[in-house]
A protein has these predicted regions:
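Conserved serine DD-peptidase/penicillin-binding transpeptidase domain
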Residues: 1-225
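C-terminal soluble interaction/assembly domains
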Residues: 226-318
Length: 318
């Protein structure tokens, strides 16, 4: 968070996948105290700098629908680039989350969507994710009696001239982020750290290509995997491909972190589903406490992994 010579408040994002309304409320309280000490009582514009990722980020397999799993990746966004809403008894749109106000910017997008309730994503075409973040921050700043007279718009930080007000780091560790994306199978969250890693290794702006290069290099050079194809980080694209044996090798390396996966009885696992494809992979314990890695990939339409898992349970008890 920066202040420029024109008294504009500038925000630069670095791809935090778990930035939520509650964080903006906290940030606004911290900023209000800092601003009070600097004798600044008002700002002109809120300027959004989302240039850490190259725009637009096109993920193979993701469409331009309003579904949450099709949310556009960006270096600055809030609430997974979605808004959750419903109608009250008077037929008026309201927020479905008490911690998130339904601000006019979001309400206008909801009305144009033609949807009565649920979640919508912000436009891929108009780069609305950063603007929504800016408008939401404006709302919380005004609650802290900080006046803002200008607009919310895109722009850039000039680190040589702009004065830094606050550096905000995510409250979540990387392990916590991975646990959440595994729990909710969130395609959007999956690609955020991928793109950020690419930017960190090969320089910004972050791109999907740089992220894929980082992941592919690790898979080949460190895990020694062969004959695989990675085009994005979530698995939503049918162009991703890997054999069961190399997925097994990956699981062997991930074993120390298995507690991040969904856990039921003696099984840590992750499922995956595309049309005509069902998969399940993870770790399973037998009655003696022995731990096994397992991979099940079914590409026959109408078939599931259930019967195969029953056989695996029997095999490990022999």
């Amino acid at each position: 968070f920066y202040k420029d010579k024109n008294l504009s408040l500038k925000i630069k994002g670095y791809g935090d996948p778990l930035l939520l309304s509650e964080n903006f409320a906290e940030i606004s309280r911290i900023l209000a105290k800092k601003i009070e000490k600097s004798n600044t009582i008002a700002f002109n514009n809120i300027i959004i700098d989302d240039s850490y990722f190259k725009y637009p980020v096109i993920i193979p397999g993701v469409s331009k629908s309003s579904e949450p799993y099709d949310a556009a990746n960006s270096s600055l966004f809030v609430n997974f680039n979605t808004v959750n809403f419903k109608k009250n008894i008077n037929g008026e749109f309201i927020s479905a989350e008490p911690e998130t106000p339904l601000i006019p910017f979001a309400a206008a997008k909801i009305k144009s969507s033609g949807i009565d309730n649920g979640r919508i994503t912000f436009s891929h075409d108009q780069n609305d994710s950063g603007l929504y973040a800016g408008h939401l921050l404006k709302y919380f700043l005004e609650l802290e009696q900080i006046k803002l007279y200008g607009k919310v718009k895109h722009g850039f930080i000039d680190t040589n001239k702009d004065k830094i007000l606050l550096k905000y780091a995510s409250n979540f560790s990387l392990e916590e982020i991975i646990a959440k994306l595994l729990e909710f199978s969130n395609n959007f969250i999956s690609n955020q750290p991928l793109i950020t890693t690419g930017a960190k290794l090969y320089g910004h702006p972050g791109t999907l290509e740089k992220g894929v290069l980082a992941l592919s290099s690790y898979a080949g050079d460190v895990l020694k995997l062969k004959n695989f194809t990675i085009v994005e980080g979530s698995g939503i694209s049918r162009k991703n491909s890997i054999s069961a044996i190399f997925m097994y090798k990956t699981l062997c390396e991930f074993k120390p972190f298995r507690n991040l996966m969904r856990h039921e009885e003696k099984e840590y696992y992750k499922t995956g589903t595309l049309c005509g494809i069902n998969t399940r992979a993870g770790y399973i314990e037998n009655s003696k406490g022995d731990l096994y890695c397992f991979v099940v990939m079914v590409n026959t339409k109408g078939k599931s992994t259930k019967n195969i898992m029953k056989k695996i349970y029997k095999i490990i008890e022999k």
